[in-house]
Amino acid sequence: MRRRVAACLVVWGCGAAADGDRVTLELANRADYLEARLEDRVLGPYVAVHPGVRVVQQNTATYQAPYRERLLTSMAAGSPPDVFQLDNIDLPALVSRGVVLDLAPYLTRAAVDIACLDQTVLSIFSRGNAVYALPRGYTPLVVVYNKDLFDRAGIPYPRDDWTWDDFLRIAKRLTRDTDGDGMIDQWGTYFDRRPFVWIPWVWAGGGDVLCPDGRRAGGCLDAPVTIDAIRWYTGWMTRQGIAPRTHNLLKSVGDAFRLFNSGRVAMMTTGHSWVPRLRPYVAAGRMRFGFVGIPHRAGVRPATAIYASGYAVPALAARRKLSIELAAYLTDSLADAVRGEAGLELPALTTAVQALVAGDTLGWEAAFVRATAVGRAPWGARIERWREVEAVLPDLLDRITLAGADPGAAAHDMARQVDRVLGATR
């Protein structure tokens, strides 16, 4: 593994060091404090063999939209970072503006073998033969479940081929009044109104929020199969009572995790970022967890979304060779292994994933890999105006779960609203 990294580093050479100049490369990402320390570990070997290069992280530790705006502002001002983290949702906007470099012509010289990457993840950052970012890591959305609650109820752990009927039956059995006060205090699942979470459930039911070309919602968001999927998903709250009412919950990002790690919710939709948060509970013997693919409607193929990030280079990079070399290093085997061990994401390199699975005694990584096999690129990686669409979609579920609207009527109204956002005509 280290030999491959070293080979990658010497291809471009150390021109800056040979000239006696110390070059500073700016690396922009959304890392928080702990993630930034992890990236420092990743960068250590690179800096060691590049004495003439200094890498400075620009850590914004912010949400995706503000990060993108800061990135676009720096590019418009002519002072972009040398390398930057590119999330799948930002790709369409940056490509359409022509501000991100197509790396494809440089990959051979940079010793990057894209055949070693997960091809679904690679496709997220590709347009035809163009490659606009080297994928760093990714996660499919899956279901995490509390094994202790399953064991107490005598319920076998779910398998990847489970259906919506299986899920509903299990969730009902795990929804309980545990203290006999007449109030439910343990729920089978958790209802999440965020589109990036619930859209994979709609896919697993055979529906979709946009039509295949991504240009309109009409005829797809309000198609019978999608309406049925939305009715089933919102029914967790409106009819089945297997999820806590969202308006009774605190509006905190950590709400869902607290409900789950306190044993009040048995199953949740989540991604790989929960792995490092759950490990301490398992290590301390406090709780046991499992991961499994999102269940599907009987007769419909399983499906989920794959969310990914990569490292890209600005089209007007001042130090193009060094920038491409750094991006290649940050997505190579050693870097992927370090991040994979930290648990924040699955590595994009298939060999790194295989090593991660082989060393995982809990079986968590294998579950994520199996889910990846039925994953697809999210809409945010395909259409530029997805942020605007995503901003209005939660209202669809709110109208059904809080205002009592009919799912069909609400979906029809939302399809018209989304079409206006996209500029489509009905």
Q: Where would I find each of the regions flagged by the language model?
A:
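Extracytoplasmic "Venus flytrap"/periplasmic binding protein-like
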Residues: G44-L117, R152-G154, R258-L259, A266-M267, ...
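A structural signal for short loop-to-beta-strand junctions that line the ligand-binding cleft
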Residues: P80-D82, A111-L149, Q186-G188, P295, ...
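Short, solvent-exposed loop/beta-turn-alpha elements that line the ligand-binding surface or hinge
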Residues: A104-L117, D160, D179-G188, G207-A229, ...
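Glycine-centered hinge/linker elements that transmit conformational signals in sensory
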Residues: I170-K172, R215-N248, I294
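Long, aromatic- and glycine/proline-rich binding clefts that accommodate carbohydrate-like moieties
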Residues: V292, E341-D395, R399
